[in-house]
């Protein structure tokens, strides 16, 4: 039986196939079967889909030139961790910066943006796992997960990362 995520916000079959191929290629790098390099690249915040699609489209041109040596994974980081909890927290919390926060609309918006990146560029994205409980909602659209400096020592983040099917990287510690 299909879950609500897959019924309401499905990933097209061709994107599922693309992601599986990219995940296998990335796994080959991680396990040493491939001598390519992985490059996770892009801005620290993705809160405007038009801008994200613009820069990821530019990355496609670079990827084509270096495809024999490098796999580019675009950073599409949809959360903004805040040390004090004050300030814009990213697209997940507030998909429209001109409106009030709306977490449900944010979940839909970030899922849509990740799917659109794959549809338009054939690059499978990375996102930061600020909230481990949200990983399931994006698990079928991400090829890399980052754990940020504020979360890297958190047990829940470590447990979730140990059970996911894509590479998880950590950002520098806070000390």
Regions found by a protein language model. Name each.
Residues 42:
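Conserved, mostly hydrophobic/aromatic
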Residues 23, 56-60, 111-114, 157:
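Generic structural signal for well-ordered alpha-helices
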Residues 47-63, 102-110:
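Glycine-rich anion/phosphate-binding loops
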Residues 69-175:
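Active-site-facing alpha/beta catalytic cores
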Residues 2-6, 174-175:
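Conserved small/polar residues in nucleotide/adenosyl-binding loops
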Residues 25-39:
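N-terminal glycine-rich anion-binding loops that anchor highly charged ligand groups
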Residues 5-29:
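N-terminal glycine-rich phosphate/pyrophosphate-binding loops that anchor nucleotide-derived ligands
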Residues 64-68:
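Short helix-capping segments at alpha-helix termini
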């Amino acid at each position: 039986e299909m879950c609500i995520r897959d019924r309401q916000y499905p990933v097209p079959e061709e994107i599922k196939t693309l992601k599986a191929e990219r995940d296998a290629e990335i796994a080959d790098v991680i396990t040493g079967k491939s001598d390519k390099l992985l490059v996770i690249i892009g801005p620290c915040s993705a809160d405007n889909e038009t801008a994200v699609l613009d820069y990821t489209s530019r990355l496609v041109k670079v990827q084509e030139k270096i495809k024999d040596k490098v796999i580019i994974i675009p950073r599409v980081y949809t959360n903004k961790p805040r040390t004090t909890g004050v300030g814009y927290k990213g697209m997940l919390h507030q998909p429209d910066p001109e409106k009030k926060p709306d977490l449900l609309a944010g979940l839909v918006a970030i899922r849509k943006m990740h799917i659109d990146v794959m549809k338009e560029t054939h690059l499978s994205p990375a996102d930061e796992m600020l909230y481990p409980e949200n990983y399931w909602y994006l698990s079928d659209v991400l090829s890399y997960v980052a754990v940020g400096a504020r979360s890297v020592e958190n047990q829940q983040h470590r447990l979730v990362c140990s059970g996911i099917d894509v590479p998880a990287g950590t950002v520098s510690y806070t000390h």
